[in-house]
Design a protein with these regions (language model features):
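A generic structural signal for short hydrophobic patches within well-formed alpha-helices
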Residues: 11-12, 45, 120-121
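Helix-loop "lid/cap" segments that line or gate small-molecule binding pockets
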Residues: 51-54, 72
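Anion (oxyanion) recognition and catalysis
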Residues: 32, 69, 107
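Active-site neighborhoods of divalent-metal-dependent phosphate/nucleic-acid chemistry enzymes
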Residues: 73-116
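Short, well-structured N-terminal submotif of metal-dependent ribonuclease cores
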Residues: 1-40, 53-66, 134-135
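Acidic, PIN/NYN-like endoribonuclease modules and their adjacent C-terminal/linker elements
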Residues: 1-3, 103-135
Length: 135
């Protein structure tokens, strides 16, 4: 079975109905029927909450967070192995703190990372599905 990890950018793409939203929706439909697995990193939940809160207000942020929890996503939470992998990535690659956790999660699971973030392109061994980048 195929396994995908949805980056924060993928979930915000879906929420904003941006280019690539249909692909994210397709993966979630497949996950809901057991055809594939969709995963998410715990840090993505925080990113969705704070980004939407900052741009649209607290109620919208909390609503977006609650919506994420209802999606057919298996959420990966912090563990010692994941922490070490994220720290190694952060120490050796020019990624943000959150992106290091997200990349580590995809690598830990052997999942394809679905994203809109060119910074992920530099990581060796990371399976990627790139959504259309913003122009």
């Amino acid at each position: 079975m195929s396994s995908y990890l949805l980056d924060t950018s993928a979930l915000l793409t879906l929420r904003g109905n941006e280019a690539g939203a249909e692909r994210v929706a397709e993966l979630l439909r497949e996950a809901s029927t057991g055809k594939t697995e969709c995963h998410g990193c715990f840090i993505t939940l925080m990113e969705v909450l704070y980004r939407v809160w900052k741009n649209e207000g607290e109620a919208a942020g909390r609503g977006a967070y609650a919506s994420c929890l209802k999606l057919p996503i298996i959420w990966l939470h912090e563990s010692p192995a994941l922490l070490e992998r994220a720290a190694s990535i952060k120490a050796t690659h020019p990624l943000s703190f959150a992106d290091a956790w997200i990349a580590a999660s995809a690598l830990e699971l052997g999942a394809t990372l679905v994203h809109k973030d060119p910074e992920f392109e530099t990581l060796p061994g990371l399976l990627e599905e790139r959504l259309p980048y913003k122009q």
